[in-house]
C-alpha cells in the first residue's frame, strides 16, 4: 500500500530521530539535486525528520552545477560576442568583441555558486527537521545506510541520485584526456579546438557557445543530421546557421578508435 508518514509539527518530538527505534529518520534522501530538494521541502511541510545525503556533485545537482545553468550562461556569453561582431543592418558596423575567456568562465562559476546558495541551500537553511550530510551512501540493509563510516536508519528512503554521463566504449578513449560537461565547464584556459561526439541538444549547445567564444569546433554525428530527435526542417535551419558560423559538421561519422 501507500507509505504512511507520521504527522507532527516541525521540530516536534513525534518525528525526532532520537525517538525512533535505533534513532531512525522518517525519510532518508540519497541525492542532492532538484528532486531531492523538492522531497525535502515536502517532508518539512509534513513535519518529517529527514536526512539528505549527497555525494559527487555539489548540492543542487546536475542542472545548477554542470547542466542547464552553466550551459545557458555560456550560450548567452557567446551570443553577446556574436552580436558584437555581426549585424543584419547595413548601416551598423560592429567593431567586434574582446573576449576574455577566463573571465567568462569565472563569471559562470560565480553565477553557479550564487544560484546554488539562493535557490537550494538558503531555501532549506531554516528547516528544523532536515539534516544535510555530504558523502556517499551505501545500503547495509533495507533500513540502514552507511555514510563516512557511520550508520543511519530510516523508515523510508528516496533514491534521487540523478544521471551520469554515458561514456561510449571507444577503443583508446580511456587513455586520452577527454572532457565531459562536468570537466569542460571548469576549463578556464580556452582550448584551441574542440571535437564533440554527438549532435544532440547538449552537443549543439556546447558547439554554438564555444565557437562564438573563439574555439574552433567540429561535431561528429553518426546519424544523418544534428538534433535527430527533431523534425528535419529544424535540423536543416540549425545546420545552415552552424556552418555559416564556421562549425564543421560531420554527419554519418562514428568514432571507433583513438
PLM feature spans:
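Glycine-rich Rossmann-fold phosphate-binding loop(s) that bind the pyrophosphate
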Residues: 31-34, 57, 197-200
